[in-house]
């Protein structure tokens, strides 16, 4: 029997033994599962190596042209709605050391029991490889996501799309217990500042500085928000 599909002969078989079905309707035959080689670590994420890098790695030098650091096998490999988290980690650590206290602060008595495990994963499996080779495989980041998901009250970090502030709340506030970067005149403290502004009809495309100034200019007298001191780190949540 000649089996033909769209005028092309694909294979020969006995009569009534050949059938075409959508690939979504087939599954691997479990009888042959034992003959398959065991999967290697990281196999599902491609052949690109992403080794653990212990020790100290300085931030990657700044570049004039971002195209030189873009392209295939550059940055953090995405997996299961990780884009928000990948972009946040890349911007926090690749070219700057302002967040390096997370990597080197010794565990205190008030820290969680798995503090060292989270810190080592962040430093040796994500930050150092980023700074050294500008690539981190998704399974390395998934390890951190799994830790944060189990150690904080922010759930769904392993597969759901979140806002960056939810990730920062899990990592900075709940797990690593980083001192707040901002202290406001109201007495509130925070790790990031949300820019709340009204649209200015006189500005077509506002800069970050425009939005920042306008946000702090909102209100009068005691209701106007001010910074008590210049923050060591300023993370801004932009208006949408």
What are these regions (language model features)?
Residues 1-240:
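UBL (ubiquitin/ubiquitin-like) substrate-recognition surfaces
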């Amino acid at each position: 029997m000649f089996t033909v599909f769209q005028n092309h002969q694909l294979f020969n078989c006995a009569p009534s033994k050949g059938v075409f079905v959508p690939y979504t309707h087939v599954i691997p035959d479990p009888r042959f599962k034992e003959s398959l080689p065991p999967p290697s670590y990281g196999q599902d994420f491609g052949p690109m190596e992403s080794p653990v890098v212990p020790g100290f790695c300085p931030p990657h030098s700044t570049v004039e042209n971002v195209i030189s650091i873009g392209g295939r096998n550059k940055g953090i490999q995405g997996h299961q709605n990780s884009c928000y988290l990948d972009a946040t980690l890349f911007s926090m650590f690749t070219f700057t050391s302002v967040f390096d206290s997370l990597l080197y602060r010794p565990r205190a008595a008030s820290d969680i029991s798995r503090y060292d495990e989270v810190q080592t994963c962040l430093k040796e499996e994500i930050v150092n490889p980023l700074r050294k080779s500008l690539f981190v495989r998704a399974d390395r980041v998934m390890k951190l996501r799994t830790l944060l998901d189990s150690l904080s009250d922010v759930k769904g970090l392993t597969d759901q799309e979140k806002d960056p502030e939810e990730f920062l709340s899990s990592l900075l506030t709940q797990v690593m217990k980083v001192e707040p970067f901002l202290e406001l005149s109201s007495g509130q403290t925070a790790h990031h500042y949300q820019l709340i502004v009204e649209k200015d009809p006189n500005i077509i495309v506002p800069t970050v500085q425009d939005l920042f100034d306008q946000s702090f200019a909102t209100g009068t007298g005691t209701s106007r928000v001010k910074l008590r001191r210049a923050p060591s780190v300023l993370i801004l949540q932009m208006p949408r």
